[in-house]
Each structure stands twice: as C-alpha cells, then as structure tokens.
C-alpha cells in the first residue's frame, strides 16, 4: 500500500519578532486589497488563509504547489526574505495554535487574536478557499486558544496593546486625570484604548474618525467627545496625548500639524503613540521640539514588565499546544491512510 502523504500544511509570514514596524507596514492588508491578494495566493495552493494584524502578516496554505516563499513575496512585490519564516507540517499547525492562543503575540495572552483568526477563516470560506484540511486546522486552533485561556492563568489581568499604550502615557506624564487625550480611530482597538484612558482617570477624550457616525457612537458609548475629522488640526492644541489606532493610506497627522499645535501651547509637551500598522502619524513628528512620538515597537518594555506575573503559565500552555498539534497530525495520518486504502481497493476492483 502506498505511504500516506506528509501533512501538507505550510505557513509563511513575518511578525513583530522578525520585522520592525517599517517593514510590517509594507505588507499590511487593507480590506479592499484582501480579495486580490487571496486570488494571487490561491494560484499557489488549494486552500489559503490570510491572517493580517498590526503585528503580523501570515499566509497559511494547504495543498501547496510551488514555493510558498515566492508566493508571499509575489503577493506584496517586496524583497522580504530576511524577515520571513516558514513552517511546514505539524510545525505549521502548532504555529497557528500558538498564534490563536496569544502565545506568539507582542502582548502574550491577549485575546483579540482569537477573533482575528476567526474572521480570517470566515473570509477564506466565503471565497471557497478553506477546505477539509484548513477547516480542521483552524477549528483546532480556535479550540486550542480557548483551552489555553481556560486551563492556564495566561490571560489573567492580561495587558493589551491599548492598555500598554495608556501605561506608556502614564509613565511619561504621571497622573492622567487632568490631561486631555485624542484617539484616532473608532474600531475595536480604539474602543479598548478609550476604555483604558477612562480607567486611568482621563475625563476628556476626543474621538476622531473619518466616519463621523462611528466616532459619535464610540464617544457616546464610553463617555468621550466626537470630533469631526476636518477639525483635527484645530483640536490638536487642546490635547496632551494622541493615540492613533486607525487605518489610512497616508499620514493623518504630519510634523507640520504638530509643530503648529505646539506653537499654540508653549511650554507644554505632546505625547503621540501610534499603534496603527501602517503608521498614520508621520515619523518626522519625532524631530519636532516638544513632541514625543512612540510606535508599536516602543511598547515592548511595557509589555515585558507586565509579563512577569504570567510566565508561570507558559509551560502548561505550550504543553497544550504540543498535545493538540499531535492530535491533528494523527487525524491527518488516519485520514490519508483511509484514502490510500480506498484508492487501492478501487484499483483492485478495476
């Protein structure tokens, strides 16, 4: 009887550990680009899942034909080899399990990634790109994420990118209750950021989004003030902290905007934290006197301080990942063996 084929599952990608934000933003995926990217990748595999977050862009492939590295680089048109990793077979399965459980995140144990994986899978299914193997692997990944969070203390009092950004502002400014803040964006991360700002005592938070209705809805929900996007420049002199968590094809706040804002508030510094990928705060802001600019990569120190209390949960979490990864490999081997036997019987009948 023919030997069962090896587990035909591959991941190729980059993340915050292999690429700085300057590289990650080059492969960030905007919603309007997703269909074309998946169409390109589908020429290299039977099943495709594209997972793109602020800290990673990864392509999961099943039924691969061709070089997955070339498929990734061809999709984005950049020479990215120095930043890419490739895992195959069970190693690729375990990687997705670790990602979904929050073990591979900048903020270890964060929970947003579970929903991001689920949405990526839904997108693949809607386009007919998730078949038997991809469905099984992703279902296993979602189960792994739930099991790690419910059976370990990894997600207890977990810090998020949003809370880390607010903590960074507190470290720079001290007590925030007398400070004014401005959030760029109205999505899930912006909502978390506003929640943490309010918890830190900030009474006055402006919410700016290019869709005014979304800004109003978020402000009303959590006690902020909606600010029309066209009034952003006028609002900047009022605020001490700007946290950007939105998507835009260009810089929303430029160095000149900040220079003019600071001229209207002499002697008062401004702290700007960009947790968007691609970044929407002009990096040149860092050269403006009185402006202090941070991005996602600057949050590492904050995250590491908050990680100490959860390190004890890591061995148990990794053991769960190994166990469930092995279960998937056994399922695949059993399935392939059965298919091989069926093929052999069919030949014998002929």
From Swiss-Prot:
Catalytic activity: (S)-4-amino-5-oxopentanoate + tRNA(Glu) + NADP(+) = L-glutamyl-tRNA(Glu) + NADPH + H(+)
Gene3D superfamilies: Glutamyl-tRNA reductase, N-terminal domain, NAD(P)-binding Rossmann-like Domain
Binding positions (NADP(+)): 185-190
Residues bound to substrate: 53-56, 105, 110-112, 116
Enzyme Commission number: 1.2.1.70
Molecular function, one GO term: NADP binding
Active site: 54 (nucleophile)
Site (described: Important for activity): 95
Alphabetical UniProt keywords: NADP, Oxidoreductase, Porphyrin biosynthesis
Pathway: Porphyrin-containing compound metabolism; protoporphyrin-IX biosynthesis; 5-aminolevulinate from L-glutamyl-tRNA(Glu): step 1/2
Family: Belongs to the glutamyl-tRNA reductase family.
Oligomer status and interactors: Homodimer.
Domain text: Possesses an unusual extended V-shaped dimeric structure with each monomer consisting of three distinct domains arranged along a curved 'spinal' alpha-helix. The N-terminal catalytic domain specifically recognizes the glutamate moiety of the substrate. The second domain is the NADPH-binding domain, and the third C-terminal domain is responsible for dimerization.
Described function: Catalyzes the NADPH-dependent reduction of glutamyl-tRNA(Glu) to glutamate 1-semialdehyde (GSA).
PANTHER family per the UniProt record, alphabetical: GLUTAMYL-TRNA REDUCTASE
Protein name according to UniProt: Glutamyl-tRNA reductase
Lineage: Bacteria, Thermotogati, Deinococcota, Deinococci, Deinococcales
Gene: hemA
């Amino acid at each position: 009887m023919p030997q069962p084929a090896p587990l035909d599952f591959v991941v190729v990608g980059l993340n915050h550990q292999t690429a700085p934000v300057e590289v990650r933003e080059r492969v960030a995926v905007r919603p309007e680009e997703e269909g074309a990217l998946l169409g390109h990748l589908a020429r290299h595999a039977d099943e495709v899942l594209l997972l793109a977050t602020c800290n990673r862009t990864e392509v999961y492939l099943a039924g691969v034909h061709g070089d997955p590295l070339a498929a990734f680089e061809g999709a984005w048109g950049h020479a990215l080899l120095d930043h890419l990793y490739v895992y195959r077979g069970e190693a690729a399965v375990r990687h997705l399990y670790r990602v979904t459980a929050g073990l591979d995140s900048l903020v270890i144990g964060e929970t947003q990634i579970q929903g991001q994986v689920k949405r990526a899978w839904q997108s693949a299914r809607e386009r007919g790109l998730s078949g038997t193997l991809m469905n099984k692997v992703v279902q296993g990944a979602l189960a792994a994420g739930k099991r790690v969070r419910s059976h370990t203390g990894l997600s207890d009092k977990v810090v998020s990118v949003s809370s880390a950004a607010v903590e960074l502002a507190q470290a720079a400014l001290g007590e925030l209750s007398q400070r004014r803040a401005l959030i760029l964006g109205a999505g899930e991360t912006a909502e978390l950021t506003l929640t943490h700002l309010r918890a830190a005592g900030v009474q006055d938070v402006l919410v700016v989004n290019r869709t005014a209705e979304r800004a109003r809805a978020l402000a009303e929900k959590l006690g902020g003030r909606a600010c029309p996007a066209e009034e952003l420049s006028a609002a900047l002199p009022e605020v001490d902290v700007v946290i950007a968590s939105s998507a835009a094809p260009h810089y929303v706040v430029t160095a000149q905007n900040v220079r003019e804002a600071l001229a209207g508030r002499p002697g008062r510094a401004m702290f700007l934290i960009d947790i968007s990928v691609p970044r929407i705060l002009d990096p040149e802001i860092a050269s403006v006197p009185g402006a202090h600019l941070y991005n996602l990569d600057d949050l590492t120190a904050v995250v590491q301080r908050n990680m100490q209390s959860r390190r004890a949960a890591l061995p148990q979490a990794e053991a769960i990942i190994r166990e469930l990864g092995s279960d998937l490999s056994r399922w695949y081997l059993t399935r392939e063996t059965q298919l091989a036997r069926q093929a052999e019987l069919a030949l014998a009948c002929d």
